Amino acid sequence: MLNYTGLENKNVLVVGLAKSGYEAAKLLSKLGANVTVNDGKDLSQDAHAKDLESMGISVVSGSHPLTLLDNNPIIVKNPGIPYTVSIIDEAVKRGLKILTEVELSYLISEAPIIAVTGTNGKTTVTSLIGDMFKKSRLTGRLSGNIGYVASKVAQEVKPTDYLVTELSSFQLLGIEKYKPHIAIITNIYSAHLDYHENLENYQNAKKQIYKNQTEEDYLICNYHQRQVIESEELKAKTLYFSTQQEVDGIYIKDGFIIYKGVRIINTEDLVLPGEHNLENILAAVLACILAGVPIKAIIDSLTTFSGIEHRLQYVGTNRTNKYYNDSKATNTLATQFALNSFNQPIIWLCGGLDRGNEFDELIPYMENVRAMVVFGQTKAKFAKLGNSQGKSVIEANNVEDAVDKVQDIIEPNDVVLLSPACASWDQYSTFEERGEKFIERFRAHLPSY
């Protein structure tokens, strides 16, 4: 960690506790700042708040008194708190500096940064980059929106390590000096408009990722969205990824991932399924090549990386049949992606909490579905859907029973896909629990040698 002195004896107000606020407050205190934490929720019984108070950090909770701004503090804002909250709105009017916890991670570390943002795919890209580093002798520490507080991880990395940071649009607002060596924008679609108010504001938040980059840095982005992503502020060397055509960067041609005319890997050897994941893979591969990760480590990762837990996660193969856990697919859009990810015959496990909706919008994506095993409150609806399309339908009591019933109908090379298109709460406390039950049952049917 750098001995950063820019906040010594400065008044700093951390607005919003949670994990990032807690770690930011501790770091700021360590850097010599006079720290106050404010949260609109009552924190009188909160363990983290009590821990901060034991360090001499003032905690004000239950409301946002504007008197906290009277000593003109620097604001460190939790990314989840919108600028419309009274104390932040007033701080803007007073011209106070407002930073994010991610900005702190940059100020205290000399480690080069690979920063990943985008509407879709950023968690997959970040995780895949982390896995490629893990397969090499280099160190890439995951941080940010992926679940590891950036300012905490930044204190632990060496200058020779990489910080691999997933950034939401919320975290990118408030960037002042933050400068990744390699920035990735996976894509930009309409999202979070309740926070950003309009699409232009959302797009501009994403573009903050490259505003401090120089000609020595890299921006990796989707070639087919370059008009949306690029702006006059862009100074970094821009490289593209495309699954459709040759570009200055990385692309797919004749079934191979290609960089600078060199074939990296046949796409048939990739474990991570889905057309949408090809773009994620290209972005991750290009970033790791630029960071010096050996091609062998990249290939090792691509032939073993099975995705994020419960997101079209490759679970394993039993004989000739691959099993995929997509328990996080709690709506029809997510299941559309899943069903569209395979060319082989699919045995589709679906059903769950009944929220009153129908599922006819899935019909165009059911071409490769050979059979359906339905469960949960919506099993009658899914049975009706399957029968209307001439699919073989079996009813099951729950996910575990569904996996058992699969064994009676499975044929060579069938893909077994759990993609419920429904929330789990009718039978399971979380989608994670539902996914774990699927995995447990899959393992129970593996042959013992």
Swiss-Prot record:
ATP binds at residues 118-124. GO terms for biological process: cell division; cell wall organization; peptidoglycan biosynthetic process; regulation of cell shape. Pathway: Cell wall biogenesis; peptidoglycan biosynthesis. Keywords: ATP-binding, Cell cycle, Cell division, Cell shape, Cell wall biogenesis/degradation, Cytoplasm, Ligase, Nucleotide-binding, Peptidoglycan synthesis. The keyword Cell wall biogenesis/degradation applies. Gene3D superfamilies: Mur ligase, C-terminal domain, Mur-like, catalytic domain, NAD(P)-binding Rossmann-like Domain. GO terms for cellular component: cytoplasm. Cell wall formation. Catalyzes the addition of glutamate to the nucleotide precursor UDP-N-acetylmuramoyl-L-alanine (UMA). Belongs to the MurCDEF family. This is UDP-N-acetylmuramoylalanine--D-glutamate ligase. It comes from Staphylococcus aureus (strain MSSA476). The lineage of its organism: Bacteria, Bacillati, Bacillota, Bacilli, Bacillales.
